[in-house]
C-alpha cells in the first residue's frame, strides 16, 4: 500500500488521557512532529475538532449530489457539497455552538476559520471561501454511499451528539 500526504499541518494540538501525562506525550511526539502544541486536555482537542462542522451538514444537506456521485459523476466533497447560503449557514451555526460550549468549559477554543489559518495557513472571510480555496482539499471526491460514510456514522454519534449533550 501507499500513503499520499497532501500537506502536513503547520500546527496541531494534542493531549493525553489523563492530562497529567501531557508532558510525557509532548516530549515523545515533538521529536517526530515538531509542529505539535500541548492542549489543556482531550476536551480541548475534541471541542476544536473541525470534523463535526466540516462533514455532517454538507453530507446530509446534499444527498442528491451524493446520489449523482454514486451514479458516476465526478464530484468533489469540499467544492460541490459546501454550498451557499444554506450549507455554509448550518456549518457556521455548528461552529458557533462548538465555540460557545468550549468557552463555557473555560477551554482555549478556535473557530474553524482560526483552525484553518493555524493548521494550513489557509484564510478567507467565510467558511465557504476557506473550503473552496484550500488547495489541500481540492482532490477529495464526494462520497458515493451515505450509509457507509464516516461523515455520518462517526461524526454524528461521536461528535455532534456529545456537543449537543454539553450544550
What does each model-identified segment do?
Residues 84-87, 94-136:
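Small-residue-rich helix-loop
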Residues 18, 22-26, 87-95, 120, ...:
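Generic structural signal for well-ordered, non-membrane alpha-helical segments
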Residues 44-63, 105-110, 116-122, 167:
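Short flexible/disordered coil segments
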Residues 73-85, 112-113, 140-148:
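Short, flexible active-site loops
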Residues 1-92:
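Rossmann-like dinucleotide-binding core of oxidoreductases
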Amino acid at each position: 500500500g501507499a500513503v499520499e500526504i497532501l500537506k502536513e499541518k503547520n500546527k496541531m494540538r494534542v493531549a493525553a488521557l489523563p492530562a497529567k501525562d501531557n508532558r510525557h506525550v509532548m516530549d515523545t511526539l515533538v521529536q517526530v512532529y515538531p509542529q505539535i502544541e500541548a492542549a489543556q486536555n482531550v476536551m480541548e482537542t475534541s471541542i476544536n475538532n473541525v470534523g463535526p462542522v466540516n462533514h455532517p451538514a454538507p453530507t446530509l444537506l446534499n444527498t442528491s449530489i451524493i446520489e449523482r456521485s454514486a451514479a458516476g459523476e465526478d464530484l468533489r466533497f469540499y467544492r460541490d457539497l459546501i454550498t451557499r447560503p444554506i450549507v455554509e449557514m448550518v456549518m457556521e451555526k455548528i461552529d458557533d455552538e462548538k465555540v460557545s460550549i468550549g468557552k463555557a468549559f473555560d477551554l482555549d477554543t478556535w473557530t474553524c476559520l482560526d483552525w484553518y489559518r493555524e493548521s494550513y495557513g489557509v484564510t478567507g472571510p467565510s467558511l465557504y471561501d476557506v473550503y473552496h480555496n484550500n488547495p489541500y482539499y481540492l482532490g477529495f471526491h464526494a462520497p458515493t454511499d451515505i450509509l457507509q460514510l464516516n461523515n455520518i456514522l462517526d461524526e454524528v454519534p461521536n461528535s455532534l451528539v456529545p456537543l449537543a449533550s454539553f450544550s
